[in-house]
Amino acid sequence: MNARTPRPVYCSTWHLHHNLALARDICAGRFTHAGATIVMGGQPDWTRKDLRAMPAWWAECIEFNYTLDLAFAFHTIREQRYLDTWQRVVGAWAADMRPDYGSPDALARRVQNWLYSWAALEESLSFTELEPIVQETVVESLCRQAQHLKTRLASKGHRRTEQLYALLVVALALPDQEGSADLRRFAWPELHRRMLVEFPIDRRRHRAVGAHESMVELRTFLAARENARRFGLPVQASFDEHLMAAVERALMPQPEETSMPFPVTDPRDSLAIAAELLRRPFASRS
């Protein structure tokens, strides 16, 4: 692994992106989002102004969630076209689009999805290497996007948590890149503080938020905790105490809930899986 190859970080949403039909569509240049389909054959031109004419389609597309489906397809079917398509769609964005393009939320999800999917591609037995120019361009774009995101962080709430986590993912995946150490030193302590604020042990002090948002945010903290374990980051005892209390509350069935399984996009499904991570030995605490 060279300095421009990302280290694999834990992805808590990997199991939600196993759509082979979607991966085939992306290979064919068909991008379906928010109920609309746009065909971009060959090398996608992300600078096309007409793409922005459908804001809902554009907002979903530029998060690059489908790169995880491409990686799953490549890992499962081992056909080169999935790797080639990933390089085309991601490489084109990295080469043609400014690092500050899009909302901070979209940017945070985009850098995570690029890194998660890249690492998954490399785990396939069929993987050889990315084209050097694509690898260099994507890494440079990731670092520049992360630096820009740091200047546009939300001031509070679940949006700030996810954006901080995106910075941590970049820092852990690309530790040898300039600025990564600073990102890690900034993002990880900030996530500690967010954990204590967003999920106090006294549930009466827990802020009022939508159940979906709260679950998504807790899933983010679980992923952050697992990556702290993987990469040996120091973890304060208070972080684990608040996290365990939040998990126990979240997994308790509510009176209005039924025994029906969660839909695949429900963050509680990911929470149930990620909660298993907490049964592993914790990293050294500071």
List each language-model region with its residue ranges:
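Structural helix-adjacent loops and short alpha-helical linkers that scaffold large soluble proteins
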Residues: 73-86, 118-139, 171-188, 228-243, ...
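Carbohydrate-active enzyme catalytic cores, enriched for enzymes
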Residues: 205-286
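Extracellular glycan-targeting catalytic surfaces
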Residues: 1-155, 161-168
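Long, charge-rich low-complexity segments
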Residues: 119, 162-175, 266-280
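A structural signal for well-ordered alpha-helices, especially hydrophobic packing surfaces
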Residues: 114, 118, 122, 146-153, ...
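Acidic, Ser/Thr-rich low-complexity linear motifs
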Residues: 130, 156, 203-211
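Histidine-acidic residue clusters that define the catalytic metal-binding segment
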Residues: 194-203
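Alpha-helical membrane segments in multi-pass integral membrane proteins
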Residues: 182-193, 209-219
